[in-house]
Amino acid sequence: MEVDINGVNRTNNSVPSTTEGSSPSKPDPEKPRCSSTPCSPIRRTVSGYQILHMDANFLVGFTTGEELLKLAHKCATTEENPGESLPAFRSKQLESGLSRSSRIYKARGRQYQPYEIPAVNGRRRRRMPSSGDKCNKAVPYEPYKAVHGPLPLCLLKGKRAHSKSLDYLNLDKMNIKESADTEVLQYQLQHLTLRGDRVFARNNT
């Protein structure tokens, strides 16, 4: 019954083999002490599994767990195969714990960094379509639609870096004698400025 109490469900195969091999050499009072205290290196399998369980849950005590496993490997020399499988499993747990923690930090970097740093860029990108939306909302000037048609895409989308400049208007090539070109220029300048709506309405009347 003590073997059932001491052993974990995972260690059903390893615990009876340790008790069979070391029960004549070790007295009985050591079994509950080893099972109750995970730091005692007398029983390698039970203490090793308890340390693994603690590390898997709380991710603490990697060095102490390794030292205890080394001491347990020195103390219990009768069984070689479980001794080789346990440190391998322990190293797998250690690697999985480290990779899990690194994954957590990477996920934190993915979560916080893209939202903090490019917030200005996102705001800048949001600002340009908002001006485009204002342009679309302020389009109820029907005669100007009939004169020159829809606005150019660089004004509506605003994705280029030089979209706010007046280079795309081709001022040097424009004929000021034609009234339609001046109206197009005035209409485009209206939507480049915020207070152009009132100014353009005042100049038009």
UniProtKB/Swiss-Prot annotation:
**Main location per the UniProt record:** cytoplasm
- Region Disordered, annotated ranges: 1-40
| Keyword Cytoplasm in annotation | yes
Where is the organism placed in the taxonomic lineage, from the top? Eukaryota, Metazoa, Chordata, Craniata, Vertebrata
- What is this protein identified as? Macrophage immunometabolism regulator
Q: Please give the biological process terms from Gene Ontology that the record holds.
A: cilium assembly; inflammatory response; negative regulation of inflammatory response; protein transport
Looking at the record's lineage, which domain of life comes first? Eukaryota
Subunit and interaction comment: Interacts with unc119 family proteins; interaction preferentially takes place when unc119 proteins are unliganded with myristoylated proteins.
From start to end residue, where is composition biased (Polar residues)?
8-25
Q: Name one GO cellular component term.
A: ciliary transition zone
- Asked if Transferase is a keyword of the record, the answer is no
| Job of this protein | May play a role in immune regulation through regulation of the macrophage function. May also play a role in trafficking of proteins via its interaction with unc119 family cargo adapters. May play a role in ciliary membrane localization.
Q: Name one Pfam family in it.
A: UNC119_bdg
Give UniProt keywords alphabetically. Cell projection, Cilium, Cilium biogenesis/degradation, Cytoplasm, Inflammatory response, Protein transport, Transport
User: Where is this protein localized, as stated in its record?
Assistant: Cytoplasm; Cell projection, Cilium
InterPro entries (UniProt xref)? UNC119-bd
